[in-house]
UniProtKB/Swiss-Prot annotation:
Belongs to the universal ribosomal protein uS8 family. Keywords: Ribonucleoprotein, Ribosomal protein, RNA-binding, rRNA-binding. GO terms for molecular function: rRNA binding; structural constituent of ribosome. The keyword rRNA-binding applies. It comes from Nautilia profundicola (strain ATCC BAA-1463 / DSM 18972 / AmH). The gene is rpsH. One of its GO terms (cellular component) is ribosome. It holds the Pfam family Ribosomal_S8. Gene3D superfamilies: 3.30.1370.30, 3.30.1490.10. Part of the 30S ribosomal subunit. Contacts proteins S5 and S12. One of the primary rRNA binding proteins, it binds directly to 16S rRNA central domain where it helps coordinate assembly of the platform of the 30S subunit. GO terms for biological process: translation. PANTHER family: 40S RIBOSOMAL PROTEIN S15A. This is Small ribosomal subunit protein uS8.
Amino acid sequence: MMNDIIADGLTRIRNAAMRGLEVTQLNHSKLMEAVLKVFEDKGYIESFKVVEDGNKKFINVTLKYDENGNSVINEVKKVSKPGRRVYKGYEDIKRFKNGYGTLVVSTNKGVLPNDEAYKLKVGGEVICSIW
C-alpha cells in the first residue's frame, strides 16, 4: 500500500531521468496531474497523458532531454510531507535557486508555480521543488 502518491511519482520521474528513459508511468491522482501541468508549463517535462487500464488510471510522462541527452531535471524533491506539512506565505516563495528552479505550491487558486503564486499574492502548501 502506498501512502504518498506524490512522493512516489516524483521518485519515479527522478529514477527515469537518471536512467535516461523516454517515458515513465505514474499512478493517477488529481494533485499529481496538477503538479505535472506545472512541470510541463515550466519546460521540465515534454508532456503527460492520462490513460485508463480497466478501472485504474495511470499517467504516462514523457521526459525532456537537452541536445546532449542529459535530463533537463537536475533535482526534484518533495518538500511538504504527510508528517511535516510546509506552508509559506507569498513573500517567502518569490525566488527559488535564484530563479533557476521552481516551487510547486498548492494554493486556494489551484496548484501554481512559485512565480505565479507571488504575482497573485497567495501562499500555500509547498508540494515540491524542481530545478
